[in-house]
Amino acid sequence: MLNEVLENTERFMSSVPKTKRKKYGQFFTNETTAKFMASLFCFDLSKQKIEILDAGAGTGILAAAVIQKLYELGYVGKIYVTCYETDELVMPLLEENMALCNKLHNVSYTLSSTYKCNFLGADNKQ
Protein backbone atom coordinates (compact mmCIF):
# COMPACT_ATOMS: atom_id res chain seq x y z
CA MET A 1 0.00 0.00 0.00
CA LEU A 2 2.72 2.47 0.96
CA ASN A 3 4.55 1.73 -2.28
CA GLU A 4 1.46 2.61 -4.31
CA VAL A 5 0.98 5.86 -2.36
CA LEU A 6 4.65 6.71 -3.03
CA GLU A 7 4.25 5.92 -6.75
CA ASN A 8 1.13 8.12 -6.93
CA THR A 9 3.05 10.92 -5.24
CA GLU A 10 6.00 10.55 -7.61
CA ARG A 11 3.63 10.83 -10.58
CA PHE A 12 2.10 13.96 -9.06
CA MET A 13 5.51 15.51 -8.40
CA SER A 14 6.63 14.92 -11.97
CA SER A 15 3.45 16.58 -13.26
CA VAL A 16 3.86 19.77 -11.19
CA PRO A 17 6.89 22.00 -11.84
CA LYS A 18 9.38 22.18 -8.96
CA THR A 19 9.08 25.98 -8.89
CA LYS A 20 5.36 25.67 -8.19
CA ARG A 21 5.90 23.02 -5.51
CA LYS A 22 8.61 25.20 -3.95
CA LYS A 23 6.21 28.15 -3.81
CA TYR A 24 3.85 26.08 -1.65
CA GLY A 25 6.63 24.35 0.27
CA GLN A 26 5.73 20.99 -1.25
CA PHE A 27 8.48 18.59 -0.36
CA PHE A 28 6.80 15.30 0.36
CA THR A 29 8.00 12.76 2.90
CA ASN A 30 10.17 10.06 1.36
CA GLU A 31 9.78 6.35 2.08
CA THR A 32 12.71 6.08 4.48
CA THR A 33 11.58 9.05 6.56
CA ALA A 34 7.93 7.93 6.58
CA LYS A 35 8.84 4.44 7.77
CA PHE A 36 11.19 5.84 10.40
CA MET A 37 8.55 8.26 11.69
CA ALA A 38 5.93 5.48 11.76
CA SER A 39 8.33 3.35 13.82
CA LEU A 40 8.46 6.08 16.49
CA PHE A 41 4.77 5.77 17.35
CA CYS A 42 3.82 3.75 20.42
CA PHE A 43 0.64 1.82 19.75
CA ASP A 44 -1.66 0.09 22.18
CA LEU A 45 -2.61 -2.81 19.91
CA SER A 46 -5.26 -3.96 22.38
CA LYS A 47 -7.42 -0.90 21.63
CA GLN A 48 -10.47 -1.46 19.46
CA LYS A 49 -9.78 1.75 17.56
CA ILE A 50 -6.79 3.94 16.86
CA GLU A 51 -7.14 7.52 15.67
CA ILE A 52 -4.43 9.22 13.61
CA LEU A 53 -4.18 12.97 12.99
CA ASP A 54 -2.08 14.11 10.03
CA ALA A 55 -2.02 17.90 10.30
CA GLY A 56 0.00 18.45 7.12
CA ALA A 57 -1.11 15.43 5.15
CA GLY A 58 0.22 16.26 1.71
CA THR A 59 -0.47 13.14 -0.33
CA GLY A 60 -0.92 10.89 2.71
CA ILE A 61 2.51 9.25 2.77
CA LEU A 62 3.00 9.43 6.54
CA ALA A 63 -0.56 8.28 7.26
CA ALA A 64 -0.07 5.33 4.89
CA ALA A 65 3.22 4.44 6.59
CA VAL A 66 1.56 4.47 10.02
CA ILE A 67 -1.36 2.36 8.77
CA GLN A 68 1.04 -0.12 7.17
CA LYS A 69 3.08 -0.29 10.40
CA LEU A 70 -0.06 -1.03 12.43
CA TYR A 71 -0.97 -3.94 10.17
CA GLU A 72 2.61 -5.24 10.18
CA LEU A 73 2.35 -5.29 13.99
CA GLY A 74 -0.82 -7.39 13.70
CA TYR A 75 -3.36 -4.72 14.65
CA VAL A 76 -6.92 -5.94 14.05
CA GLY A 77 -8.98 -2.99 15.31
CA LYS A 78 -10.44 -0.04 13.44
CA ILE A 79 -8.27 2.84 12.21
CA TYR A 80 -9.59 6.39 11.82
CA VAL A 81 -7.46 8.99 10.04
CA THR A 82 -8.09 12.74 9.99
CA CYS A 83 -6.05 14.57 7.35
CA TYR A 84 -5.63 18.33 7.03
CA GLU A 85 -4.11 19.82 3.89
CA THR A 86 -4.27 23.43 2.66
CA ASP A 87 -3.13 22.88 -0.93
CA GLU A 88 -6.22 22.25 -3.05
CA LEU A 89 -4.02 20.92 -5.86
CA VAL A 90 -2.96 17.99 -3.66
CA MET A 91 -6.42 17.16 -2.29
CA PRO A 92 -7.55 14.85 -5.15
CA LEU A 93 -4.42 12.72 -4.74
CA LEU A 94 -4.80 12.68 -0.96
CA GLU A 95 -8.38 11.47 -1.47
CA GLU A 96 -7.19 8.79 -3.91
CA ASN A 97 -4.50 7.58 -1.52
CA MET A 98 -6.80 7.49 1.51
CA ALA A 99 -9.41 5.65 -0.57
CA LEU A 100 -6.70 3.08 -1.32
CA CYS A 101 -6.03 2.72 2.43
CA ASN A 102 -9.75 2.24 2.95
CA LYS A 103 -9.99 -0.35 0.18
CA LEU A 104 -7.02 -2.38 1.39
CA HIS A 105 -7.41 -2.03 5.16
CA ASN A 106 -10.93 -0.67 5.77
CA VAL A 107 -9.51 2.58 7.16
CA SER A 108 -12.03 5.35 7.82
CA TYR A 109 -10.83 8.82 6.94
CA THR A 110 -11.83 12.46 6.97
CA LEU A 111 -10.17 15.09 4.81
CA SER A 112 -10.21 18.83 5.41
CA SER A 113 -8.64 21.59 3.37
CA THR A 114 -8.99 24.24 6.07
CA TYR A 115 -7.20 24.83 9.33
CA LYS A 116 -10.08 26.70 10.96
CA CYS A 117 -10.52 24.24 13.77
CA ASN A 118 -8.32 23.42 16.73
CA PHE A 119 -6.50 20.16 15.95
CA LEU A 120 -6.62 19.12 19.58
CA GLY A 121 -10.37 19.65 19.56
CA ALA A 122 -10.97 18.01 16.18
CA ASP A 123 -13.64 15.38 16.59
CA ASN A 124 -13.78 12.36 14.31
CA LYS A 125 -16.54 10.20 15.79
CA GLN A 126 -17.55 7.39 13.52
Which residues does each PLM region occupy?
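SAM-dependent methyltransferase catalytic region
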Residues: 1-126
